[in-house]
Amino acid sequence: MLRMISLILCLLTAACYAPVNTVSDDLDTQKDLTPTDVEDDMFLNTLEGIHDVDPFSLLPVSPITWDTCSGVEGDHPCNIIAPDQREDNFGLYAEFGRPIVLDFSTGWCGPCRAAAQHAEAVQEAFSAHDVLYVTVLIETADGSVPGQADITQWAQEYDLENSLVIGGSRALLESSGGPWPLSGWPTFYYIDRNMVLRDIDRGYNANEIEHSLNWLVTL
């Protein structure tokens, strides 16, 4: 009965006060907070040092530490990013740690097509060394910039499954302001596990490709 009378008096006088033994901060500073806000704040404050953790410090260290790139032997090549024949995104730098050969080819180049006939066999022959053979198709048979359909067709025509095909354009070439030097078709760029351009071969020679890859995997 006394509790009910106290409640009625409280409501009539608008003078209800929290008991001194309640768990509360300054209510005036929290009057705009929802119960969820207060609960979240209390939870975060219980995590000692949580605000001192840099989330980027939890990420693995990137092996890509250089600021410049070029098509010069002994330097780091510039990154190439493009979808492959499966429409998966290929990134050259994402393959850090693998020996890589880039085959810059065109659809109107006879020796380029001869190289394409053996690309999958080369890929399989060096699979134990984790070599990656990537054809960068610069132009189609009619000289156009290749689209996704052209990339897929090239892969199907030459039965390329583990050997990748990506699309490029002349914008990649030094002659058009790009980083890759090219003076003949096809041109092969050999990149070691540390993403260093080690050798450049111009023209197609099956024995030369095998020789260059046998040397590359020893680095």
Report residues per predicted region.
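Thiol-/selenol-based redox modules, centered on thioredoxin-like
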Residues: 183-219
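Short pre-active-site segment immediately N-terminal to redox-active cysteine/selenocysteine motifs
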Residues: 97-100, 104-108, 140, 184
